[in-house]
Amino acid sequence: MNSAPPSRAHQAAQRRGKVAEGLAALWLRLKGYGILAKGLKSGRGSGAGEVDLVARRGDLVAFVEVKSRATLDQAIESLTPFQRQRIERAAAAFLARRPELASCGVRFDMVLVAPWRLPRHIPDAWRID
């Protein structure tokens, strides 16, 4: 079964997302973080997880969700519980493959991107329930 090609609107949204992720990575680098991974995906199906950026500063590993919307308020409100679970699954899979990070603290951050605004980094945006 062939799926239809993505619409132009979908392609444009993907491009905007990639630009936002690039800006977020740059912003985090300026704050002293190193980027360990971008566009991290783990697994398939219902157990799949994904996270936009994995960043490290010292003994801290941050799994970062990047949200780009018309306003920063819309961006922060756009993270769903389902998306959080996918990020948490990807984080667990990443850490399982990287035993050298076992002694690091782990945090879930967000970087919000909106037109004509500096990115906003929200450290410790949520904790695992």
From Swiss-Prot:
The record ties this protein, via InterPro entries, to: Restrct_endonuc-II-like, tRNA_endonuc-like_dom_sf, UPF0102_YraN-like
- Gene Ontology MF annotations: nucleic acid binding
Q: Which domain of life is it from?
A: Bacteria
Pfam families, A to Z: UPF0102
SUPFAM superfamilies in the cross-refs: Restriction endonuclease-like
- Protein family: Belongs to the UPF0102 family.
Q: What is the name listed in the Swiss-Prot or TrEMBL entry for this protein?
A: UPF0102 protein amb4503
Organism encoding this protein:
Paramagnetospirillum magneticum (strain ATCC 700264 / AMB-1) (Magnetospirillum magneticum)
